Amino acid sequence: MTSTRVDQLRILEAEAVHVIREVVAELERPVLLFSGGKDSIVLLRLAEKALGMGGSLPLPFPILHVDTGHNFPEVLEFRDRRIRDAGHELIVASVQESINRGRVQEDSPTASRNQLQTRTLLDALEAHRFDAAFGGGRRDEERARAKERVFSFRDEFGQWEPHAQRPEPWSLYNGRIRRGEQIRVFPMSNFTELDVWRYIALEELELPSIYFSHEREVVSRDGMLLAVSSVIAPLQGEAVDRVQVRYRTVGDLTVTGAVRSDAQSVASVIEEVKSSTISERGETRADDRTSQAAMEDRKREGSRV
C-alpha cells in the first residue's frame, strides 16, 4: 500500500476518532452498535483508538448487538470472541424475546425479522437510557445514508426526520438533545467500501470467515444466492447448488445474499471490490429491494441502519 493511500486512511481514521471523542464529551450514555460485520469491526477498532488506548483498555461504554435469531453462526462466534478478548461489556437485545413478550408479531418462523428488530433496538436504548448510539453506516452504501448527517437526530420515538437535520459546518457538531431524544452517530460516514477493506488490511483486523471464499449450499432466489439453513429452505422448483461464495455484507440469513468468489484473503477481496460496479447492498441485500425508499422508511421508524 502506497504512503499516499495510508495517509488518506489515517485522515479518515482521525475524522472518526474526533467524532467519537466529541460524542463522549457531549453526551452522557453512549453505546456502540455491533453486528459483527466488517463496518462495525472497523468502528470498534476506531473506538478503541479513540478511547481505549488502542485496545489495551476496555471501552468506557458498552457494545450492543440486536440478535434477530437469524444470524450467521460464524458471526455470533466471532462477536463473542472479539468482545470477550478485548474485555468490553456486551449487551445482547433479542428479537425472539420481543416476540415472546408480545412487543412484535412474527408472520412465520422463517420470515425476515429485519423490520422486527427496530422495536427491539428502541426498547434496549430506552431500557438502558442510552442517548447516543454509534453505527458503522457509510454514505456510499445507499441513497438514504448519503443524505444523513454524521449526527443523526432521533425524536422521543426514535424516529428520523430528514428535513429536521442540523447543519454540520467545518466538522462542528451540536449534540444538544431534550430528554428522551437520541442521536445516532456515524463516524465512518466518509469511508467507502474500498476504504473499509484497505483499513482492515492496514490494521490487520480479523473478520468472520464468511467474508472470504468458502463452499456453501445455496439457492438462487430473486437474483440472489441465499444460504440453505434452518430459516431458508428450497422452494418448489428451486435447486440447491454447492458454490464457492463469500459475503460482502453481514445481515440476516433470510435477506443476505452471497456473491460468487474465489477471494480468500483481504488483498484478493480488495481487488474484487475495486472492479465491482454494483454497491454491496444493491447486490446482496433483499431488505433494500422492497422499494427504492426501503432504507429511508426503516430509518424513519427508528432502525439502527
Language-model features: locations:
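Nucleotide-activated chemistry modules centered on ATP-dependent adenylation/adenylyltransferase
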Residues: 1-305
